């Protein structure tokens, strides 16, 4: 058995994490400048190699926890990227994962420690290797699922206004949404609950605050917007 494996060249496997946040009505991406060769100084996603005792998912969870200090994040595999020349250092196949976080939950000291920046997706710079393609594929994945899965709530605080929720959808879809129709549909969804609290910070008149009832959704996980 050992001889069989030794006859084949070694290929490295890594994970790269595409971390999206929502701030100032914009969908943002967490990136930093590479501190090693190849590509030193280039903008890049954050990732790491898969350990010998790790699954792909476990490796991505480890990287995300190191990066954000957060656990139990929404995370989804985007795909595998294995172009022969994607990494000039070694033959590396990377599996990309998309994560959604509430920016307010993110420990800013960790961002500073890793030298990371929140960059609006619409102004995303050229990234290292095929990382722009990873982000593009992750965004396409979110657009495919946002109307059939409650993804957007991962980007919002526990209590949010309908305006904030609409802006998340518009930021991900890249288009404006009719306010009247959006609110009419939202009010038909049982697990988006209106609370008795009022937002007086982002609304001059005071806007009602809503919350996502995950328990109610789990009991009847049908979502279509």
Spans of features found by a protein language model:
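N-terminal strand-loop-strand
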Residues: 2-43
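Conserved Nudix-box catalytic region and its N-terminal flanking loop in Nudix hydrolases
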Residues: 26-70, 82, 147-167
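Short, His- and charge-rich active-site/binding loops that engage polyanionic ligands
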Residues: 29, 33-36, 40, 47, ...
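NUDIX/MutT-family hydrolases
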Residues: 98, 108-142, 146, 155-163, ...
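Short helix-coil junctions and helix-kink-helix linkers
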Residues: 167-176
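RNA substrate-recognition surfaces in RNA-acting enzymes
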Residues: 177-208
